[in-house]
From Swiss-Prot:
Record membrane topology: Multi-pass membrane protein
Transmembrane stretches, start-end: 30-50, 64-84, 111-131, 152-172, 200-220, 237-257, 271-291
Record protein name field: Serpentine receptor class gamma-9
Annotated Gene Ontology cellular component terms: membrane
Protein family: Belongs to the nematode receptor-like protein srg family.
InterPro entries referenced in this protein's UniProt entry, alphabetically: 7TM_GPCR_serpentine_rcpt_Srg, Nematode_SR-like
A Pfam family that the UniProt record links to this protein: Srg
Keyword Glycosyltransferase: no
Compartmental location: Membrane
Statement: the UniProt record of this protein carries the keyword Cytoplasm: no
An example Gene Ontology molecular-function term: transmembrane signaling receptor activity
Gene Ontology biological process terms in this record: sensory perception of chemical stimulus
UniProt KW keywords: Membrane, Transmembrane, Transmembrane helix
Gene it is expressed from: srg-9
Length: 336
């Protein structure tokens, strides 16, 4: 669930609402957890494959290094959703004791809320570098790896540190409990009025969308000219990046709608739709990479499917030559 807004929606309940059915709300949670747990497992496997089991293969490819950062972010966001955010929204039987626990242990809220916004800020930055990486691979295929290898350390540092320039107000701001459905979630007020985290994130995502669209158009135009000169593996990663970009634009669209339409942004509809919009990206990302990249799928799942199976080594056929000696005895031919 997205809880970036520092301006809470109109809330009438200042305590847990007992009118929601425990069973119905729990089923809602289980249904959402059911589709979030498998991608979380895939994220963990992808990170294990890239950085442990097949480190020598993937660490030399800058795209996978950058994508591993996206996997870390997506993995943590799913864990927060599964075990904290949606858990306490859709498990109303824990609303009273859990809300009191968080209110009496404010350190947990002071960690959770800035961390959530940090991850949401890092995602568009990673998206920018993913699309730029694929665009440069078709524009400068010869020098592409050399340039990205040289600047990879800077990219990692930039993505890791720059979100703090955006989320600083969420760190120093007081955190509160917002009662929602039969449960609750945690939100931050603004210590500095003009430093609106929703606006900051909207600007970052807007820049990411503009760069993504421009890079994708350039990439497709260049790929159409290269045709068969481009390696199939590079084409595969470009395709994966394009689909990933589409998934990124889905939550970005609804975030923009909430920022430009105040009535929608403060309505319960926004708070209901936005989490599922983010699921398109966080749940879809590992599925896309596993589906599109045959090599990664083979390493992560240790299976091969269809046309993306690793090519088998050609069979060696040994040909033995037999020499026939012919002799004639009394007109009879004898073969040895």
């Amino acid at each position: 669930m997205d809880t970036n807004s520092t301006t809470p929606m109109s809330i009438t309940d200042m305590e847990c609402n007992p009118n929601y059915s425990y069973l119905v709300e729990n089923i809602k949670y289980l249904l959402q957890a059911a589709y979030m747990v498998p991608p979380a497992f895939l994220y963990a496997r992808i990170l294990y494959v890239i950085w442990v089991k097949h480190r020598k293969v993937y660490s030399r490819h800058q795209f996978f290094v950058i994508y591993s950062m996206d996997s870390i972010v997506g993995f943590i966001l799913l864990l927060l959703d599964i075990f904290i955010t949606r858990f306490f929204v859709y498990v109303p039987q824990l609303c009273i004791p859990a809300s009191k626990f968080f209110q009496s242990h404010s350190l947990l809220m002071n960690i959770y809320y800035p961390l959530l916004n940090y991850l949401h800020c890092a995602q568009p930055l990673i998206q920018i570098f993913l699309t730029l990486n694929r665009m440069s691979s078709v524009i400068w295929p010869v020098d592409h790896n050399k340039v990205w290898s040289k600047n990879l350390s800077f990219i990692v540092a930039f993505v890791s540190l720059s979100p703090f320039l955006i989320i600083w107000n969420t760190i120093i701001s007081p955190k509160i409990i917002i009662y929602y459905f039969g449960g609750f979630f945690m939100l931050g007020l603004k210590a500095v009025e003009w430093a609106d985290i929703s606006l900051f994130l909207f600007l970052v995502r807007s820049v990411a969308v503009i760069i993504t669209v421009a890079s994708t158009v350039i990439m497709f135009l260049r790929m159409s000219k290269m045709k068969k000169r481009m390696k199939s593996s590079e084409r595969t990663l470009c395709l994966a990046c394009v689909i990933h970009s589409i998934c990124f634009m889905v939550p970005s669209f609804f975030e923009a709608l909430a920022n430009f339409n105040e009535a929608y942004g403060s309505s319960w509809v926004n708070f209901l739709i936005q989490p599922f919009a983010w699921d398109v990206l966080n749940v879809g990302s590992p599925l896309i990479m596993i589906f599109v990249s045959g090599q990664l799928r083979h390493h992560v799942l240790e299976i091969s499917i269809g046309c993306c199976k690793p090519k088998n080594k050609p069979k060696t056929i040994t040909v033995h030559t037999v020499t026939a000696h012919v002799s004639s005895r009394n007109g009879t031919s004898i073969f040895r």
